Structures are given as C-alpha cells and as structure tokens.
Amino acid sequence: MVLLVSNVFIIDRFFPQDALYPKNRAFVEQLSSIDAAVPSFTLLEICGVAGFRLSTKELESWLFRFTNVYPVLVLDAFGLKGQDAEEWWSNFVGEVAGGITRKMTLGDAVLLREAENYGPEAIITWNTKDFSRRTQVPVMTPSAFMQRN
C-alpha cells in the first residue's frame, strides 16, 4: 500500500494548467491498479481545500463517498479502534507534535503519523521535500513511483 498526499487530488481536480498536471493525471489514471490509500485526516484536509471550489453536492460526495470519486482506500485514524479515547488522543497529539517539531505543517505531520503507524510502501507526493529526512518511510513523486512499478 502507498499513502497519497492531498496535492495529487488537488492538482487533478483544480489545476489542469499546472506543469505537473499531465504526469499527475497519468498517475491518477493508474490508481485502480495501485494499492493506494488516503488517511481520513488527509481526506478532511483535501475537502477543506476543495470546499471553496466544489458545489455542496460534490463536496458531500468527496467527504462521504470519496472512494466513488477516486479508486483509493480511506483509512481510519490509526489505533482508534479498541483504545480509550483519552489515551488515543494523548498518543495522537504526542506523535503529531513529533512531526511538527521536525518543521512540518499540521497536515503533513498528521499524514506522517499515519504513515509511520500503517507502514506503507511509500508516501506519494509532488512535494517530497516536505517529508524528506523526516521519516524512514520512502517518499517519492507519482512519476518516480510509476517508473519504479
């Protein structure tokens, strides 16, 4: 499994003039053959950004039926099931704070927390610098992932 960062979906839906769009689109077209996932927190981040440009109906589709929009798995927050909420929250905040102290945005720190717990094959993003030297999980662009696979 690979974890996808929000920029893959934002570029695909809203930035067809972006220089990365053709490569990004080629990657998105391959998603059905890739074991790809999006953490639930990343989905909320995506929808927070997209909400300014989507109709209410389309935004609801993204929020509650994202797997109908893109062929990816939406992951539950790691460790939430079977744990006391207070204990989970304390662990979650500590792990996310660890990312923030490594000079990461909140969204990237949350995704990194999920990645380091789920143990994916790679984190896929166009902004590899956001994760480089901050994790042992391999980080690559969609193009690099497609070339490798």
Kindly label every feature range from the protein language model.
Residues 44, 79-87, 144-149:
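A short acidic, often aromatic-flanked loop/helix-cap motif at beta-alpha or helix-coil junctions
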